[in-house]
From Swiss-Prot:
Disulfide bonds: none annotated. CDD domains: Ribosomal_L29_HIP. It comes from the Eukaryota. Belongs to the universal ribosomal protein uL29 family. It is found in: Cytoplasm. GO terms for molecular function: structural constituent of ribosome. Keywords: Cytoplasm, Ribonucleoprotein, Ribosomal protein. Component of the large ribosomal subunit. One of its GO terms (biological process) is maturation of LSU-rRNA from tricistronic rRNA transcript (SSU-rRNA, 5.8S rRNA, LSU-rRNA). This is Large ribosomal subunit protein uL29. The keyword DNA-binding does not apply. Its main location: cytoplasm. Gene3D superfamilies: 1.10.287.310, 6.10.250.3450. It comes from Xenopus tropicalis (Western clawed frog).
Length: 123
């Protein structure tokens, strides 16, 4: 098999990708047998290409799977940990905009009764 491009793989369905993955794994095992039995140099150099192709297929499968999960959980209240934004531990625990703006009943009353003073500037 020739070198596989990731952009060609993205259009394929999951079943096709899994079938291609199986084919590549079979080919890799055949190449490894050829290596042990003393195969041609062209077959030995092909091992690397097939390994990288397997990695590309697996990468595309995992990326599409994660993309579909993101679509599924979009707008839901709870998301799996690996779909949430990473950030730092401190940033994840920080109050959000809504929580920062909240005031107690007592503070709301104080703000209402003693509003900010406005001063006129003498020209």
């Amino acid at each position: 098999m020739a070198k596989i491009k990731a952009r060609d793989l993205r259009g394929k369905k999951k079943e096709e990708l899994l079938k291609q993955l199986d084919d590549l794994k079979v080919e890799l095992s055949q190449l490894r047998v050829a290596k042990v039995t003393g195969g041609a140099a062209s077959k030995l150099s092909k091992i690397r290409v097939v390994r990288k192709s397997i990695a590309r297929v697996l990468t595309v499968i995992n990326q599409t799977q994660k993309e579909n999960l993101r679509k599924f959980y979009k707008g839901k209240k709870y998301k799996p940990l690996d779909l949430r934004p990473k950030k730092t531990r401190a940033l994840r625990r920080r109050l959000n905009k809504h929580e920062e703006g909240l005031r107690t009943k007592k503070q709301q009353r104080k703000d209402r009764l003693f509003s900010a003073r406005k001063f006129a500037v003498k020209a």
